[in-house]
Design a protein with these regions (language model features):
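Short loop/turn segments at secondary-structure transitions that flank enzyme active sites
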Residues: 15, 53, 81, 151-153
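Conserved, mostly hydrophobic/aromatic
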Residues: 48, 83, 126
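Gly-rich Lys/Arg/Thr-decorated short loops/hinges at beta-loop-alpha junctions or inter-strand turns
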Residues: 80-93
Length: 172
């Protein structure tokens, strides 16, 4: 079997448009929605930024100091209720984990509510997603959310008494 030549690969790579990427996003969402026999009452989605190491000199792979490598940093959204893949957004390697995630959430909720107007939605993510744009979109679309918080002196000071109460209540 012959492999594609470099010019063929270049033409293929450059033929991909924003429109085709959006159509691909819709294929995954359409399949997810169609996988349900009845409208779900509640769905929980996990947000994850995944470090994808580069092997060579691909476009938009950049150095990411946290991961100590050249990479892409795609956002992956999966459904915690059935382990299905729901959405993927390819982002450049030096992106912040939450880059444009608010737009992805808004689009996802809009599509879900079009299919199931009464579905309750819950998003979960680590502390990288605990940024103002994410809180804003979750509040605007009236969805539940659980985002981690990075430990800081202020957070520890403000939660110290609550932690002590919880320890006493559990008899630890």
């Amino acid at each position: 079997m012959d492999l594609a030549s470099q010019p063929t690969l270049s033409r293929f790579e450059n033929a991909i448009s924003i429109k085709s990427l959006k159509q691909l996003r819709d294929v995954f969402l359409d399949q997810f929605i169609a996988s349900f026999d009845a409208a779900p009452r509640h769905l929980t989605f996990d947000l994850d930024a995944v470090d994808d190491p580069a092997h060579g000199h691909q476009q938009l792979t950049f150095w990411h100091g946290y991961y100590d490598q050249n990479q892409y940093l795609p956002l992956v959204i999966t459904c915690a209720d059935n382990d299905q893949f729901v959405m993927l957004s390819l982002r450049h390697g030096s992106a912040h984990a939450a880059l444009a995630a608010d737009d992805d959430l808004a689009y996802l909720v809009t599509r879900l509510r079009r299919a199931w107007p009464d579905v309750a939605v819950h998003f979960r993510g680590d502390c990288a997603f605990g940024v103002p744009d994410m809180y804003d979109v979750c509040e605007r679309f009236r969805v539940f959310y659980t985002f981690g918080l990075t430990a800081s002196a202020v957070l520890q000071r403000e939660t110290e008494s609550l932690l002590a109460e919880a320890i006493v209540a559990r008899g630890v």
